[in-house]
Each structure stands twice: as structure tokens, then as C-alpha cells.
């Protein structure tokens, strides 16, 4: 099984008042100082002159991260798929037809725009328009692991002037993962498969690591599937998963192939909140916890005991109170995972896949979109 070991290490070089971050495979942990120069996922060098007060998030995972580090008051614009977060009703909706609305983003007058890899890939012209208007944009790489989620949490804190809070939440995530790995070290690992709208999560995806950290073997990855790809009935029969992991927003497949699996025969269906399993953001740890409780309840109890008795990360900087608020909020919202059942959310969330119906004249086009951030 995969492990997600300690990954937090300083990689920032500082020269005078110019703080330069080169985003690599590890995360930065020095204090927030400005000007800050970063190289984003497109290779673009971005210079942030001062602590941004107004932040627009073009994807819900970045918005979720801002909420998780206690910086939601700095967010002035969100996508429609971030509506599940408390307080987004007062934020500018920056979504438009087929991607972000250039006009709405400009109307929010942001100091910084956080851009997902998927949005840049799908709408490079709109991103170019925003940059041409003088806005500061940082494009994130595709998150293919829980380590990437941890790194992005720290990096968003750093970019937005919330270094201590970002570092603390990133460290807390790593500690939780370490504890889960500790309690599952000697457990059996039945085969599980994540399914949504006929697709699955193979190797080289953060959902693969969610599944495996939660105590399962990812049958799709073991079958040689990589990325977010269709899964055939033949593959389902061949894998014969013991557990099916499915987001709350997706319908449960009802085909003879699925009905024949060990998972269906034993009602081993794990419903996980969509915004937990399909967004590479801090709440992904709750997806891991849900899977762990369903598949290894004794290990889950041991983990919960460790979570409540082991001191968490905190800071001694001027931002420590903000960090502590962030951690407290995260703990308060963490309810005991529901295992094989879960409550359907009213909002669509922002999954790895969502179905968009676009009417052009009298023709309805159905598009399946794979946001990756």
C-alpha cells in the first residue's frame, strides 16, 4: 500500500526583500514576506508585491482551503461549485458559461486569483485575458496525491499571507495521515473501487491515495488503470471489489456486473461526501476517515483516540491565533464518518466529474468535464 510520509520542508530562497518560491516536490515553510516571487504551473513567474486582501478562487478546492485555514473573509469571489461552504452567498459568483467569467472576476477587483489546472487547461484564453488586464494569477498543478494536497494547503497559505495557518493545517493533515497509517499498518487490505458516472480513479490520482490510505487496495490501480478513466463492466467483474466507494452526488450503478460483485452481495457500499472525496483540499482527510471507519472500525476507533489525545500542530508566530481557530473549526466540523451511508448534499459540489447540459438551439449537448483541481 502507498504511504504519505512527512513532506514538509523549507525550499524557499530569500534574497533581500525578494522572497522567491520555486514550487517543486516539497512545500515551503518560511514566514510570509513580500514581495514574493513564485513560478506557477505554467512556468509563469508571478510577483506578489504585498499581502493580498482580496482573493478570488476559480475552483472550490482553493476556496475550501481558504476556509480551512480561516481566511474565508479574504475571499471575494468563488465558483458556483463552492456554494456548499458557509458564507459563499455573500461572495461574487465568478462562474460563467463554460468556465470563469472574465467580467465577474474583474468586477471582484481581486489582488490575487487562484487558478486550478483544469480551468487553465479548459479556458486558457480567459486566463490570458485576465492576465492582460493586469490581474495577478497563480495556476496550480494537477494534484495527483495527498502529498500534493498538503503542499497546496501550505502554498495557498503562503500566497495569501496566511503562512502560519497554512503551515498548521498542512501539518495537521500530515499528522492525521501518519496516525491512520500507524493504525492500519498490520490490517488486511480488501480491494475497493471508486466509481462515479461510469468512471473510476486509477493510479496517479489523489483519490487513489485516499482509497489506499483509508485501508483498501485500489482495484482500478491494481488493474493497470491510471488517471480518471471509464471502467467497463468487464473490468468490474474481473476486479470483483469487496468495497465500492462512491460520492454522494453520483448514482449507484445498477448493472449485472456490479450486482455480481462481492461489494454488492454484502452491501459494502461506502458513500462519501462529494466535496470530501472529489476535491484535492484539506477535507479529503474526511474521505479517508469515512473509508477507514467502514472497512476497519477497530482501527478507526484507535485513530480517533489518537486524534483526540495527541497534541496537534500550532504556531508561535503572530498568526498563531488564526491557525488555532482554523484547527478548531476543522475539528468541530468533523463528525463521525457514516460508513456505508451518507447524507446527500443539496449543492452539486465540484467533483472530478460533473455533467453539464448546454442548450444550443434545439440541440442539447451533454458534456462530461474532468476538473483536476
Language-model region placement:
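Structured C-terminal subdomain patch of bacterial secreted/periplasmic proteins
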Residues: 32, 147-155, 167, 246-341
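Basic- and aromatic-lined ligand-binding clefts that recognize polyanionic substrates
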Residues: 54-66, 162-217, 307-324
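A short, structured surface patch at a secondary-structure boundary
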Residues: 32-39, 45, 49, 53-129, ...
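Secretory targeting signatures
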Residues: 1-38, 47, 314-373
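Extracytoplasmic ligand-binding site segments that recognize negatively charged/polar headgroups
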Residues: 123-125, 141-155, 189-209
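N-linked glycosylation sites
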Residues: 18, 22, 26-28, 86, ...
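Short helices/loops that flank or line small-molecule/ion binding pockets
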Residues: 101-110, 230-240
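His/Asp/Glu-enriched short active-site or ligand-binding loop at hydrolase and phosphoryl-transfer sites
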Residues: 79, 204-229, 271
Amino acid at each position: 500500500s502507498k504511504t504519505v510520509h512527512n513532506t514538509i520542508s523549507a525550499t524557499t530562497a530569500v534574497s533581500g526583500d525578494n522572497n522567491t518560491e520555486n514550487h517543486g516536490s516539497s512545500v515551503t515553510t518560511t514566514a510570509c514576506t513580500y514581495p514574493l516571487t513564485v513560478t506557477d504551473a505554467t512556468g509563469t513567474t508571478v510577483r506578489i508585491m504585498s499581502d493580498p486582501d482580496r482573493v478570488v478562487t476559480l475552483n472550490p478546492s482553493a476556496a475550501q482551503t481558504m476556509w480551512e485555514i480561516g481566511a474565508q473573509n479574504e475571499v471575494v469571489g468563488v465558483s458556483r461549485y463552492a456554494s456548499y461552504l458557509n458564507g459563499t452567498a455573500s461572495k461574487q459568483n465568478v462562474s460563467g458559461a463554460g468556465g470563469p467569467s472574465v467580467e465577474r472576476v474583474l468586477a471582484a477587483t481581486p489582488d490575487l486569483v487562484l487558478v486550478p489546472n483544469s480551468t487553465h487547461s479548459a479556458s486558457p484564453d480567459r486566463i490570458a485575458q485576465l492576465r492582460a488586464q493586469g490581474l495577478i494569477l497563480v495556476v496550480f498543478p494537477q494534484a495527483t496525491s495527498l502529498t500534493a494536497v498538503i503542499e497546496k494547503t501550505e502554498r495557498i497559505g503562503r500566497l495569501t499571507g496566511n503562512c502560519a495557518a497554512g503551515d498548521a493545517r498542512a501539518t495537521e493533515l500530515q499528522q492525521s495521515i501518519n496516525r491512520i497509517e500507524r493504525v492500519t499498518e498490520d490490517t488486511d487490505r480488501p480491494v475497493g473501487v471508486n466509481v462515479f458516472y461510469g468512471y473510476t480513479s486509477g493510479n496517479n490520482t489523489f483519490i487513489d491515495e485516499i482509497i489506499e490510505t483509508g485501508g483498501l487496495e485500489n482495484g482500478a490501480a491494481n488493474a493497470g488503470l491510471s488517471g480518471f478513466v471509464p471502467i467497463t463492466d468487464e473490468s468490474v467483474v474481473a476486479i470483483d471489489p469487496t468495497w465500492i466507494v462512491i460520492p454522494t452526488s453520483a448514482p449507484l450503478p445498477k448493472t449485472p456486473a456490479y450486482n455480481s460483485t462481492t461489494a454488492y452481495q454484502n452491501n459494502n457500499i461506502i458513500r462519501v461526501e462529494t466535496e470530501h472525496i472529489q476535491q484535492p483540499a484539506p477535507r479529503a482527510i474526511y474521505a479517508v476517515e469515512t473509508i477507514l471507519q467502514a472497512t476497519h472500525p477497530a482501527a478507526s476507533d484507535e485513530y480517533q483516540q489518537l486524534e483526540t489525545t495527541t497534541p496537534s500542530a500550532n504556531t508561535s508566530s503572530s498568526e498563531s491565533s488564526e491557525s488555532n481557530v482554523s484547527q478548531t473549526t476543522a475539528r468541530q466540523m468533523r463528525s463521525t464518518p457514516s460508513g456505508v451511508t451518507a447524507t446527500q448534499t443539496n449543492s452539486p459540489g465540484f467533483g472530478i466529474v460533473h455533467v453539464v447540459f448546454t442548450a444550443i438551439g434545439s440541440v442539447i449537448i451533454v458534456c462530461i468535464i474532468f476538473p483536476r483541481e
